[in-house]
Regions:
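Hydrophobic alpha-helical signal peptides and transmembrane signal-/tail-anchor segments
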Residues: 22-27
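Low-acidity, Ser/Thr- and Arg-rich intrinsically disordered low-complexity segments
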Residues: 6-8, 20
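Asp-based, Mg2+/Mn2+-dependent phosphohydrolase catalytic module
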Residues: 6, 28-74, 83-107, 114-314
Length: 314
């Protein structure tokens, strides 16, 4: 009799556990799509150098701004045309500066380039002029790095180029490899406040030597700008692009219908704006002038149809 009672209790307990697990899975299925709230009615794409730091110095107010986004669960991505660093490298750098960020917040032109190439050809191969951030992104996306007969010659930032490497890249392109630039920035700032030739300068050399024109998935290309926005799972009307450079951040954002915010702490001054045929949606002195309320007041309102459709699980 005791055995029967114990067995019955065991069966009942197991049934209860199965029911609890089933309910948990059902809840996950029904509520995996978040309803629009103040926290996810908009998202941000944020440039790094010149916006949250300048060289090795944090721009005042940047840490509080970013950490407040994290606290309020505002979706955002940092966008950088620097292909040298991996996501992990960038995360470690920002954490050291006081930002409470994670790997998924980082989106580089190296990642954009690797994802693009992975969609272009089955099992693509590449000869690489670049550093760890670029090679890691390519490997992660299944692109084999080779020295002979590559499908692509991929160029990123680097301090270890040799003339022999450039000569080899030139001949690979002349023999049929496609020339890919992670970005076309002519120069880039260094931590000590100096400037060195950027990826675009090296690519220009190869273009002149080969007669070929490079394709670049980096900012302001829609390849990078759109893919980053898709990671936020928001439409263009609820996406803000914050940057300091008119030719990449602001132009790229405007061309895709994002609301653009130019900060004057980096490469563009107020007087520079007169030189451009296009203008940012908003101009602020610094990221310190922005907060969540500022964006809530400027984001496109949700229509009743959107509220109803987004509130339903899909």
């Amino acid at each position: 009799m005791t055995f029967i009672v114990c067995a019955s209790a065991l069966v009942l307990n197991t049934a209860v556990q199965v029911l609890r697990i089933s309910i948990l899975f059902l809840r996950c299925f029904l509520f995996s799509y978040k309803r629009p709230t103040a926290a996810n009615r908009f998202g941000l794409l944020i440039d790094m150098d010149g916006v949250i730091y300048r060289g090795g110095e944090v721009i005042p107010g940047a840490v509080d701004f970013i950490n407040n986004l994290v606290d309020q669960d505002i979706p955002f991505r940092f966008l950088t045309n620097n292909s040298q660093r991996t996501r992990l490298d960038l995360t470690a750098k920002l954490i050291g500066m006081g930002f409470r960020v994670a790997n998924h917040h980082m989106y580089t032109c190296a990642i954009a380039t690797a994802r693009f190439l992975a969609k272009q050809k089955e099992k693509p191969t590449a000869y690489v002029l670049g550093e760890t951030g670029l090679t890691t992104a390519l490997n992660t996306n299944g692109i084999a790095i080779v020295d002979k007969n590559p499908d692509y010659v991929v160029v990123g930032e680097g301090r270890t180029y040799t003339f022999e490497m450039l000569e080899h890249a030139t001949n690979l392109v002349l023999n049929g490899a496609k020339l890919i630039a992670t970005n076309l920035d002519p120069n880039c700032p260094t931590a000590n406040g100096k400037t060195r030739p950027g990826c675009g300068a090296v690519v220009n050399l190869l273009e002149k030597a080969t007669g070929q024109t490079a394709f670049s998935p980096g900012k302001p290309s829609p390849v990078m700008m759109r893919d980053a926005r898709k990671e936020l799972t928001l439409d263009a009307g609820r996406t803000f692009m914050i940057g300091d450079t008119m030719t990449t951040d602001i132009r790229g954002g405007l061309e895709l219908g994002y609301t653009t915010v130019l900060v004057l702490t980096g490469g563009t001054s107020q007087s520079d704006l007169a030189n451009f045929a296009y203008q940012p949606t908003h101009v602020v002195d610094s990221i310190a002038d922005l907060d969540v309320q500022w964006f809530n007041e400027r984001v496109e309102p949700l229509s009743q149809h959107e509220q109803d459709s987004q509130a339903c699980p899909v």
